[in-house]
Every structure is written in C-alpha cells, then in structure tokens.
Design a protein with these regions (language model features):
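Conserved S/T- and glycine-rich ATP-binding loop of Class I adenylate-forming
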Residues: 18, 24-27, 65, 108, ...
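Conserved AMP-binding/adenylation subdomain of ANL enzymes
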Residues: 42-114, 128-129
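Gly/Ser/Thr-rich phosphate-binding loop
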Residues: 86, 113-118, 127-188, 201
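Conserved beta-loop-beta connector loops within the AMP-binding
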Residues: 203-222
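Structural detector for helix-capping/boundary residues
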Residues: 1-4, 16, 39, 111, ...
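Short Gly/Pro-enriched turn/cap motifs at secondary-structure boundaries
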Residues: 10-13, 191-197
Length: 224
C-alpha cells in the first residue's frame, strides 16, 4: 500500500459483470466458489441494515464496526467491511492468530466499538469466559450473528453482558443475508431467525418443491 499509486482509472462495468469469487465453508463437501456480480454489494445493503438496526451516512458518523470474521469470508467482507464503507462508516482492523474472548472484550471496550458481527462460536466462547460479570465501558449499539441457532441462554446473556439484543440472521455464501431479526422494529424470539429482508421472497418447501403452508417436523427446505 505504501508504494501504490493514488491515481487510477475506474473500469466501466455492468451490474451483472463478475466482481469476485468467494468460497463456501464446504457444508456439503469441499468448498465451492460462488461467483458474485457487482450488484451483490447493493443487494446486501438491506440485509446488513436490518440486523444492525439501520445505518446512516449522515454526519457526524457515530457507528464503528469490528468483527473477528476474516475479510476473505463472506461474513467479514460482505456482512461488515464493504457495507460499512458504503455508508462511510469506519471499520476497525485487528489481526489475531486465533479468537480470544478476553482480547475481544478489551478491544470492544477500549475502542468503543458500536457495531459487530460475532459468529455463534465466538459468542459462546465469550459467554464461557465471562458468564455473568459486567464489562465496563461497552458502548455497543448492535450485534448481529448467524450460522447456527444461538439459544435462549445466549440471547439473554447478550442482553445482560453486552447490553444489547443479538439479532440473528440467515444466509449462505451464494445467497447471503436473506432473513433477519431487527430488535428496533420487531420482537426477537428464541429459535427465530426473523423475517425476510426487503427485496427477498422466502418460502418453506418440501423435497418436491411444493409450498408448505404450515411447516411441522417433516423435512423441509428454505426456498429463496
């Protein structure tokens, strides 16, 4: 970066032109590359605003993002870094060899982090490290999480220790941030990942692609 030129010519692209390839976590086998077009970033914006209870580019900017999620992953890049920059919101960068709950509490407190995406595994480690002790100087405004169900105990811990409700959301690398909670406009319930993010239609279907009007215990699929 020190030797990079500060002048460049922007290449003209279409919204449908390929922008980048992000690899999945390999849920059903090895990681697979998901080719995302340039329009993907703008398509992500509503899905970021909902769990973070709406963002603003108005001055003065009061929000401040940080996440332990790697920026090479869809969660770090498209759930935090690029959307925050879209709004002109600063993002804290911190390099660590592995997730450390003590360092995380210290960083969020000292730097006055306002917004964070914390994967469920990170939240569970933080709860194990500090199950009940009040943490001083936390100024969090929003916490988003997704990847697996958090459970009632973890959600209640978030309210008591982090000082905010944790907004759970759902998405995949190739179709991210499609369903979400938003404590600012709807009650959050244990076991619920919220409602469809504006711009998406979400349906529960069976193996034959038929709509299930009243999902029960039978095998069903999320269709977006």
């Amino acid at each position: 970066l020190e030797h990079a030129s500060d002048s460049y010519i922007t290449k003209k692209t279409k919204a449908s032109d390929p922008a980048l390839i992000i690899y999945t976590s390999g849920t059903t086998g090895g990681p697979k590359g998901a080719l995302l077009p340039h329009r993907s970033l703008l398509g992500h914006i509503p899905g970021v605003e909902i769990p973070h209870e709406f963002l603003s580019s108005s001055e003065p900017v009061t929000d401040l993002f940080w996440t332990p999620a790697d920026w090479a992953w869809i969660g770090g890049l498209f759930d935090v870094l690029l959307p925050a920059w879209h709004f002109g919101i600063p993002v804290v960068s911190y390099r660590s060899q592995k997730f450390d709950p003590e360092v995380t509490f210290d960083l969020i407190s000292k730097l006055q982090i306002k917004n964070t995406f914390l994967p469920p595994t990170a939240l569970k480690m933080m709860k194990s490290f500090n199950p009940s002790k009040t943490v001083k100087n936390l100024k969090l405004r929003t916490v988003g999480s997704g990847g697996e169900a958090l459970g009632e105990d973890l959600l209640e811990w978030g309210k008591q220790i982090l000082g905010v409700g944790i907004n759970e959301f759902y998405g995949q690398t190739e179709c991210n941030l499609t369903v979400s909670n938003c404590g600012a406009i709807m009650p959050t319930r244990q076991g619920s990942i919220g409602k469809p993010v504006p711009g998406h239609e979400v349906r529960i279907i069976n193996e034959n692609g038929e709509l299930i009007k009243e999902p029960g215990l039978d095998l069903s699929l999320i269709h977006i």
